[in-house]
């Protein structure tokens, strides 16, 4: 089998098509060009760094693994005050006492300040705990960036000041696309 027709190459081509056809929208749901979407997101991160604001990153499952990884790069490369909220004892405490749907919103109500930024990652965009966290961040006056996929009408896709959406129901492709976008942002945060 040559590389030209190998399944790995075809899968990589699917990823390329998916990422290059990503859709960006603003808080009014207005479509943004690829350049505008990326630049607006990068500006929010640079503004957070300049203001010494916190950048909180959340996700479930594979999305939690993605934000754990990018958290390192945001601190090491981007010099951001970045934090994840899925430390195991905190997750079990909040889930037990307040329900898993509040696992991120409850800590954000305590920790987040106006001008802080939340990056919410959910492949389906339907996770209640992620959407509750977005609402909590908005309540304290913070900014929100969402990364989602799957259905065009997923609720998370319309909740952020900036929204990055991938038109696929393939978890693996959506997750890798989210990681690609976040890595690209991190690479452009170098001071």
Predicted region positions:
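Conserved N-terminal alpha-helical segment that immediately precedes and caps sugar-phosphate-binding
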Residues: 1-191
